[in-house]
Structure formats: structure tokens, C-alpha cells
């Protein structure tokens, strides 16, 4: 029989139950017992959903209150000293690492009680993980209590449980050395000891299978790391415990032979992104090794072409027999929970989709077809084929006018009138900004009042006119506060926006939205990615009226705020029936019209955010340049239609810039603002070494932490930035938008930021 298993399930709940419970706990509204009860219920529901869909081996340990990489750090006892305190619960220590804490005692440092761990992108996804920290004092020690508790709970439902654990080599690869310690692999022997102890503990619990996730096998691995895999997995063998080595997010390519020959009982491959690996692995796989085929895309929401997949899988089944397992390509963490919850979605489009629950049902259909013949699931296969054909032919998908515009894109469409050196002189003359000009990234707190009014408008309780009146009041409040604080370049605060991608997608043709299509971005932060189902175009102006209104309230410049084409692409569920480049070009042309309309309305500082630029990089460096070429082109198509005195800003966060600095320079934005405070300005080294030519605003405080930065802390960070970059090219700003913060935190933080800029201006005057 063909076995169906799952690598992981969404943890947040179909209605974001975990998010709301965690946030209530952080506010002190519920205690740990109540939080644990919510988590217990969610796990039970998720496991039952998987069992009902025919999953044979349940994943255990994929649930997390915040982040599975942070869970691994606690599993192996790698807890930063700064987060530890006497009398503090393990859960509070956990959240302290994740979120940091505000200053609690007079003796605390200037930057508050405890800063949060650094956060960065999980491979090429929109999920963020908390970076493990390694230093000379790091010593690993097993703490498997969380995993064992969840194991006991799962066994109340089935005996077939499979712990899911981040593998030791991927854990070290993703970590960061915080002092001058040895190479990351220098920590490996100590870590292997803990992993071996963990396997021994699981064996005593009569666990039969354990899944080690090693996604770094989809990367370009140095030779010493390849050798480390051989050494580690020879040591991670126990006679009564089978190891499934799981890889995902891309083809293994040069690492395929290595992975296939490791002494594990099973190997999982993502063939949705590495289809060429499948025929190759069949020729080198040990005859006794199980092959888990990740055949259903765990990162997108489109219904799979089951008939096409069956044609691909049948010869594999004939060759492997019971040695064939089926699974999603990766954890379903990256997909919404259940399409059945969607009641307002266009019926045609809904029929083209599959969320986590439906993806497991697709696996069940494939399993039954392979084991019992296609006639056993004939009705399901006919329905699937009809949905695939209907999508391909739909007039909702295809727009001849948009396709013509894309076909006629010329190089001149992506070039500014003059080089930066000419533009910046004209811009300085026009705006007359001080040294170290201050600004924010765009959004201000989305208060409960804002959310209440938006909900009332969407439900029809208040009219468009009433809703607009509340938004104008919020904008006026934001402008007044910024002027009072003394910020130089203002923003309108984005009160009208629920999400930086969803807001634009709602007003572009070719996009559709769900009610409950939530996925986790980080911690309790959930996003509801729009779905790009067809050709994209802009039927009307999107932001111009709000920007015009904000500008009418002040003599200071107000930035227009747009989300860039690559971020619109990366943070959406993207159609899979044409190259991503084409979809990016369609979005870029739509945004170009918006940028030009903003300029015509007198908004001449325009920010086009691209926080997801690096996220789109293919995992293999040989594929980078092709992506960067069309990604940069898309940004420039969006922004290059303006005059020299119009200043284009862009914003990026959570990224290492060294290896894409040329592409960032090629964007030719007049000002770039970046996330740097969590890395203590380390990210600026890329701009210094490259001699980045344009203006730059390194983030001077971490908005993801509740800490309020002291003026002295901000001064220190600005001075550190000035060691790397000329003072006259520096802007002062937070790391990111302030949407998720509270006004009582934002106001003093911005006041301290502005005071720091004023202090340094006085010093250099």
C-alpha cells in the first residue's frame, strides 16, 4: 500500500485562534493554563483533520507558539542568557527571546530589559524564523518536555505518530555566531550528542519514525557541510527508530546523491520545485529505502492536476511498490487551513483552489488511485480534470489588452530621465531638508477604532461617506502628531489599509481575496495573501485621493506609499500557469500608472516598498541573475516614469544585502530605507564596501519589539552608521512600518529618534 504522511500542518488555526490567544496572554488577559488549553484544542483539531483526510503518520512537534526554529533552540537548550531570569516560567522565557521585553528596572541597559532575537526569512518564503545564537558559552542540553507532551496527546488519537524536528545541520546553518567563535560546524559535536540523546528518548517512548528536516540540502553547500551530513547521519542511527530525512523548497541537484546515500530509512523530495530529481533518485536510491514524494505543492493554493500527477507517479509506484510514500512538498504551514470556510469566493475561482485540508484530500485521491486503480476514484478525477480545464479557458484569467501591453514593453520604460547625481541636486534644491532628515516607513498604529470602522464599513453598517470621514480624521491626527514631533518627511499613516499587499490587490483586476485565507508570517503576525488568478491591471486610481488630502494639511512633504511589484508578487499566491516574470511586469505597469498619477497630483516623494526583493531569489546562485534582472526591471518600470525632482524611495527589511547589492543599486531609488537595528547596523557593511551611491536610511530602532529606544541608543546607532556611510547621505527612520505598535509606544520612540537626529545635527553644525 502507498503511505500518505504530512510534513506539518498550519498552527495558527482556521480563524487565527492561536494568534488571539497569544496576544491575550501577552496583554495579561489570560494565564498560561488558558493559553495551553487553546493550543491543546488546536492540535487535537488539526490532527483529527489530517486523520480524516487519510494521513497515516501524524506529524508531532510542528505546532509552535511562535516559531519552530525557536522551539528547536529550546529543545537543544540554546537559550540566550539575557532572556533567563529567576522565577520566570519557561513560556515567558520563550516569549522573551522572541519578542524582547521593555526596560523593567533602573539598572537595565539603555536599550531596555532584553532585546529580541534577530528575525529573518525562512529560505525563499514569507515566513520569518528567529535566528539561533552561537557563541563561546554555547552548550547544548536536551529539553524534550514540549515534544513529549505533544507526543502523548497525539497518541490519544493514533499510535502512528512522527515527531518532526529541524535537523542539526540546518539548525546550525541558520544560526548566527555572535562573537569571534569558531566556524558553525565547531558546535556540531556538542549538538549531535543532544540529538542522539533525543533519539534515545524517543526510542524509549516506542516512537517508530522521526522526521528530520534538512532544507539546506536544496542550497549550494560547501564541501565541508556535505561531509558533515555523512558524519552526522551515520551517528543518528538507532536500531528500532527509523529516520525520514525531509528536504524541500527546491531540487537537490548536486546534493541528491549525498542525500540518497545517507543511512536513513526514508528520503523526502519536493518534486513540485525539483521535478528533475525524481527520475534521478530512482536510479541511485537504495532498494530498501523509502522514497517520500512531495507531489502536492505545500506553498501555493492551486488545485493539483491529479491526472497528470498519476501519469508521473504510476511508474514510480510500479518500481517502488510499498516503498512509495506521498506527502505535500513541504509543511503546509505556508497555506491557509480550509477552503470550505470560504463562503464569498467566486465559485469558478474557488473550484480552482486547494488549501491545507484539501491538499491532504488530493493526496488521498492519488493514494487510492495508485493502490486500487483509477476507477475507484473516477468521479474525483473527472471533477479535477474539469476544474483544470475550466481555469485554463476562463475569460476571467485572460485579458488581451494587458497581454499586449506586456508584449510591447521597451527598455526606455525602465530608465529615469537623468542619473542620480543630477536628480539629487534638483531634489535638495526643491525640498531643502536638513542633514539627517527624519521620516517613517509608512504605516502608523492600526487602532481598535480603525479596525472597528473598517469592519463596520465592510459589513455595510456605515456608508462609504461615513467611513471616509473616519479615515480623514485618522490622517489628520497622524499629520498633526508628526508635525508636533518634528519629523521632516511625513506619511499619511495608511489608516485605510488592512495590509500592504491586500489593499492594493483589492483594487487591481486579476486579484481575488479570501475571508479566512490566513497564513503565519511570524509569531502572532498573520497575513491573508491575495490570490493572483488572472492578468493584472489597474481600473482606477488607488492611493491618490488619500495622499492629496494628507498633503493639503501640511507644508511639509508627504510621501506617497505604494507596495512594489516584486513584493506584490512574493506576498501573494501567484498563478502558476505563466512565468512569474510576466505577472511581475503586469503589476509593474499597473503601479506605474499610480506613480504617475501621484506625481501629477503634487505628491513628489513616492515610496515603493520592496521588502520581498531578496526573498524571491532562487535557492541556487546559478539562477539568481535571471531573477534579479527581471525583478529590477519590474521595479524600474513602476518608478521610472517621473521627473527628476520627484524623489523615489524604497524600503527593504529582514535581508542580507551583500550578495545582491548590485541589484539594489540597479533599482536606482533615490533613497532606500532598510532594517538594520536588530543586526546592530551590521547590514550596512554591504553598502559601505560597495560604495552605494544613493541616499540610505538605516533603521535606528526595532519596531517588532516592545522596547522604546532611548535617545542615546539611537545616537549610537546613527554614529555607527556614519562610520560606514557619509553623513549627508543618511536618513533617520525606524526599521519598518508602525502598524502593529501602540501610539503610547510609537510617540516616545519617534520623539527620541527625532531628538537623536537634532543632537547629531548640532554636533556637526
Curated annotation (Swiss-Prot):
UniProtKB keywords: Amino-acid biosynthesis, Metal-binding, Methionine biosynthesis, Methyltransferase, Repeat, Transferase, Zinc
Pathway this chain belongs to: Amino-acid biosynthesis; L-methionine biosynthesis via de novo pathway; L-methionine from L-homocysteine (MetE route): step 1/1
Residues that coordinate or bind L-methionine: 441-443, 494, 609
UniProt: Zn(2+) binding residues: 651, 653, 675, 736
Binding site for 5-methyltetrahydropteroyltri-L-glutamate: 16-19, 121, 525-526, 571, 615
One Pfam match: Meth_synt_2
Sites where the protein binds L-homocysteine: 441-443, 494, 609
Cofactor(s) the record lists: Zn(2+)
UniProt EC number: 2.1.1.14
Catalytic activity annotation: 5-methyltetrahydropteroyltri-L-glutamate + L-homocysteine = tetrahydropteroyltri-L-glutamate + L-methionine
GO terms classed as biological process: methionine biosynthetic process; methylation
Example of a GO MF term: zinc ion binding
Cofactor note (record): Binds 1 zinc ion per subunit.
Domain of life: Bacteria
InterPro entries for this protein: Cbl-indep_Met_Synth_N, Cobalamin-indep_Met_synthase, Met_Synth_C/arc, UROD/MetE-like_sf
Active site residues per record: 704 (proton donor)
Biological role stated in the UniProt entry: Catalyzes the transfer of a methyl group from 5-methyltetrahydrofolate to homocysteine resulting in methionine formation.
PANTHER family listed in its UniProt record: 5-METHYLTETRAHYDROPTEROYLTRIGLUTAMATE--HOMOCYSTEINE METHYLTRANSFERASE
Family (UniProt): Belongs to the vitamin-B12 independent methionine synthase family.
NCBIfam families per record: met_syn_B12ind (TIGR01371), PRK05222.1 (NF003556)
Protein name, entry field: 5-methyltetrahydropteroyltriglutamate--homocysteine methyltransferase
Protein's organism: Saccharophagus degradans (strain 2-40 / ATCC 43961 / DSM 17024)
Upper taxonomic lineage: Bacteria, Pseudomonadati, Pseudomonadota, Gammaproteobacteria, Cellvibrionales
The gene coding this protein: metE
Amino acid at each position: 500500500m502507498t503511505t500518505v504522511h504530512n510534513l506539518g500542518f498550519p498552527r495558527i488555526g482556521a480563524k487565527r485562534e492561536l494568534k488571539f490567544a497569544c496576544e491575550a496572554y501577552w496583554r495579561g488577559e489570560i494565564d498560561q493554563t488558558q493559553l495551553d488549553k487553546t493550543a491543546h484544542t488546536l492540535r487535537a483539531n488539526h490532527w483529527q483533520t489530517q486523520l480524516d483526510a487519510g494521513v497515516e503518520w501524524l506529524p508531532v512537534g510542528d505546532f509552535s507558539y511562535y516559531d519552530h526554529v525557536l522551539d528547536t533552540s529550546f529543545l537543544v537548550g540554546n537559550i540566550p542568557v539575557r532572556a533567563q531570569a529567576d522565577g520566570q516560567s519557561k513560556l515567558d522565557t520563550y516569549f522573551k527571546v522572541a519578542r524582547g521585553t521593555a526596560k523593567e528596572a533602573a539598572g537595565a541597559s539603555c536599550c531596555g530589559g532584553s532585546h529580541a532575537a534577530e528575525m529573518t526569512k525562512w529560505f525563499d518564503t514569507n515566513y520569518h524564523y528567529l535566528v539561533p545564537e552561537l557563541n563561546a558559552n554555547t552548550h547544548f542540553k536536551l529539553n524534550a518536555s514540549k515534544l513529549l507532551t505533544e507526543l502523548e496527546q497525539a497518541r490519544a488519537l493514533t499510535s502512528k505518530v512522527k515527531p518532526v524536528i529541524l535537523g542539526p545541520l540546518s539548525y546550525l546553518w541558520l544560526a548566527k555566531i555572535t562573537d569571534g567563535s569558531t566556524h558553525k560546524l565547531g558546535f556540531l559535536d556538542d549538538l549531535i550528542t543532544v540529538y542522539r540523546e533525543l533519539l534515545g528518548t524517543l526510542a524509549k517512548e516506542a516512537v517508530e519514525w522521526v522526521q528530520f528536516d534538512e532544507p539546506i540540502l536544496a542550497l549550494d553547500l560547501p564541501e565541508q557541510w556535505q561531509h558533515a551530513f555523512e558524519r552526522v547521519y551515520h551517528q543518528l542511527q538507532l536500531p528500532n527508530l527509523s529516520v525520514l530525512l525531509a528536504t524541500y523548497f527546491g531540487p537537490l541537484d548536486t546534493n541528491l546523491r549525498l542525500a540518497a546515500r545517507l543511512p536513513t530509512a526514508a528520503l523526502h523530495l519536493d518534486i513540485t520545485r525539483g521535478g528533475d530529481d525524481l527520475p534521478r533518485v530512482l536510479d541511485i536510491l537504495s532498494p530498501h529505502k523509502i522514497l517520500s514524494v512531495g507531489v502536492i505543492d505545500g506553498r501555493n493554493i492551486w488545485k493539483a492536476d491529479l491526472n497528470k500527477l498519476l501519469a508521473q507517479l504510476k511508474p514510480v509506484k510500479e518500481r517502488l511498490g510499498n516503498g512509495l510514500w506521498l506527502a505535500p512538498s513541504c509543511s503546509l504551514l505556508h497555506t491557509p487551513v480550509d477552503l470550505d470556510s470560504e463562503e464569498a469566493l467566486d465559485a469558478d475561482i474557488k473550484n480552482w483552489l486547494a488549501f491545507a485540508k484539501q491538499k491532504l484530500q488530493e493526496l488521498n485521491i492519488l493514494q487510492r488511485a495508485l493502490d486500487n486503480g483509477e476507477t475507484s476514484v473516477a468521479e474525483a478525477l473527472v471533477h479535477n480534470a474539469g476544474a483544470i480545464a475550466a481555469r485554463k479557458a476562463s475569460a476571467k484569467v485572460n485579458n488581451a489588452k494587458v497581454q499586449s501591453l506586456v508584449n510591447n514593453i521597451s527598455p526606455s520604460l525602465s530608465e529615469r530621465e537623468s542619473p542620480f547625481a543630477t536628480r539629487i541636486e534638483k531634489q535638495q534644491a526643491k525640498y531643502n531638508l536638513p542633514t539627517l532628515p527624519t521620516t517613517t516607513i509608512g504605516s502608523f498604529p492600526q487602532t481598535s477604532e480603525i479596525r472597528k470602522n473598517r469592519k463596520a464599513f465592510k459589513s455595510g453598517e456605515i456608508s462609504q461617506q461615513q467611513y471616509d470621514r473616519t479615515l480623514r480624521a485618522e490622517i489628520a491626527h497622524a499629520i498633526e502628531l508628526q508635525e508636533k514631533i518634528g519629523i521632516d518627511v511625513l506619511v499619511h499613516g495608511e489608516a485605510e489599509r488592512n495590509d500592504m499587499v491586500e489593499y492594493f490587490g483589492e483594487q487591481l483586476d486579476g486579484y481575488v481575496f479570501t475571508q479566512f485565507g490566513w497564513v503565519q508570517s511570524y509569531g502572532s503576525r498573520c497575513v491573508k495573501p491575495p490570490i493572483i488568478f488572472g492578468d493584472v491591471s489597474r481600473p482606477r486610481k488607488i492611493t491618490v485621493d488619500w495622499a492629496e488630502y494628507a498633503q493639503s494639511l501640511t507644508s511639509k512633504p508627504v510621501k506617497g506609499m505604494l507596495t512594489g511589484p516584486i513584493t506584490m508578487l512574493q506576498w501573494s499566491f501567484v498563478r502558476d500557469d505563466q512565468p512569474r516574470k510576466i505577472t511581475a511586469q503586469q503589476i509593474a505597469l499597473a503601479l506605474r500608472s499610480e506613480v504617475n498619477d501621484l506625481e501629477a497630483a503634487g505628491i513628489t516623494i513616492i515610496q515603493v516598498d520592496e521588502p520581498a526583493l531578496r526573498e524571491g531569489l532562487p535557492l541556487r546562485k546559478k539562477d539568481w541573475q535571471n531573477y534579479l534582472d527581471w525583478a529590477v526591471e519590474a521595479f524600474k518600470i513602476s518608478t521610472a516614469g517621473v521627473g527628476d525632482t520627484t524623489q523615489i524611495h524604497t524600503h527593504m527589511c529582514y535581508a542580507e544585502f551583500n550578495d545582491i547589492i548590485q541589484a539594489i543599486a540597479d533599482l536606482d531609488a533615490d533613497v532606500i530605507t532598510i532594517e538594520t537595528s536588530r543586526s546592530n547596523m551590521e547590514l550596512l557593511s554591504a553598502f559601505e564596501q560597495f560604495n552605494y551611491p544613493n541616499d540610505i536610511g538605516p533603521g535606528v530602532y526595532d519596531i517588532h519589539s516592545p522596547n522604546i529606544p532611548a535617545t542615546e541608543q539611537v545616537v549610537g546607532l546613527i554614529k555607527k552608521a556614519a562610520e560606514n556611510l557619509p553623513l549627508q547621505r543618511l536618513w533617520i527612520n525606524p526599521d519598518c512600518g508602525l502598524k502593529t505598535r501602540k501610539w503610547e509606544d510609537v510617540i516616545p520612540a519617534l520623539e527620541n529618534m527625532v531628538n537623536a537626529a537634532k543632537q547629531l545635527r548640532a554636533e556637526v553644525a
